[in-house]
A protein has these predicted regions:
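N-terminal amphipathic/basic leader segments beginning at the initiator methionine
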Residues: 2-49, 84
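Gly-rich Lys/Arg/Thr-decorated short loops/hinges at beta-loop-alpha junctions or inter-strand turns
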Residues: 16-24, 55-62, 95-109, 126, ...
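Anionic-ligand anchoring segments at beta-strand to alpha-helix junctions in alpha/beta enzyme folds, i.e.
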Residues: 24-28, 69-113
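Generic structural signal for well-ordered, non-membrane alpha-helical segments
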Residues: 28, 32, 36, 50, ...
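Short coil-to-beta-strand
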Residues: 50-55, 87-91
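Generic beta-strand/beta-sheet core signal
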Residues: 58-60, 92-95, 137-138, 159-161
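Active-site cavity-forming subdomains of large catalytic enzyme subunits
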Residues: 111-206
Length: 206
């Protein structure tokens, strides 16, 4: 089976240094690409930025789930690191959904599909914009594999940054997490704890 690749990389380097610009040079170099540069000037590009490798930053930031609410801060750090080391960072977003919130409902039908949407959207932006490389920042069940799938499809320099594990909460001096909420629901069904006690765990566990 022939391996799929969305683009073939020419070999062109920056005029100012040795950093390669195999894809962005096609998009922005030359007099005929002035309209493209015009659009990018409007996003904050400078003349100097057009001589730098363009590095996409795929952010999965969302208020949908606590797993991703801090991703925008990590994307800022990634952007800073790229810009300080000779690249031009360009941040874009993709979606995320929460299995933990939608489980047991019709919403679960969208869970696995969302992985494909995430991979497709990252591949679409990176391929269309001509990024020379990209960094994907993810932190939830489906956006992490979605990011990795896009990296494999695009077959260009890329890094995945994991958003980290959610720290446990605390209740009555003990650590509690999402599993404890499920356990509390079970205890309530067995008559071993009240609805108020279940909610007390839910309020602090994540």
């Amino acid at each position: 089976m022939k391996r799929r690749s969305t683009a073939k990389a020419p070999t062109k380097k920056s005029q100012n240094d040795s950093l390669p610009r195999p894809f962005s040079s096609i998009v922005v170099d030359g007099i005929e690409r002035a309209p493209s540069r015009g659009m990018l000037y409007a996003t904050g590009f400078t003349k100097e930025d057009f001589q730098k490798p363009q590095i996409g930053v795929a952010s999965t930031w969302s208020m949908v789930t606590p797993c991703n609410m801090h991703i925008d801060q990590l994307a800022v750090s990634v952007t800073q690191g790229i810009n300080e080391n000779g690249g031009k960072a360009v941040v874009f977003n993709t979606i995320t959904i929460s299995d933990g919130i939608s489980m047991g409902t019709e919403g679960m039908k969208y869970s696995l599909v969302s992985r494909e949407v995430i991979a497709d959207s990252i591949e679409t932006v990176v391929g269309c914009q001509g990024f020379d490389a990209f960094v994907a920042v993810g932190g939830c069940d489906k956006n992490m594999p979605g990011c990795i799938m896009a990296m494999a499809r695009l077959n260009r320099p890329s890094i995945f940054v994991y958003g980290g594990t959610i720290l446990p909460g605390e209740l009555h001096g003990k650590d509690v997490d999402l599993v404890n909420i499920f356990e509390a629901v079970g205890k309530n069904a067995a008559g071993a704890c009240s609805a108020e006690e279940v909610e007390a765990v839910a309020e602090v566990a994540v």
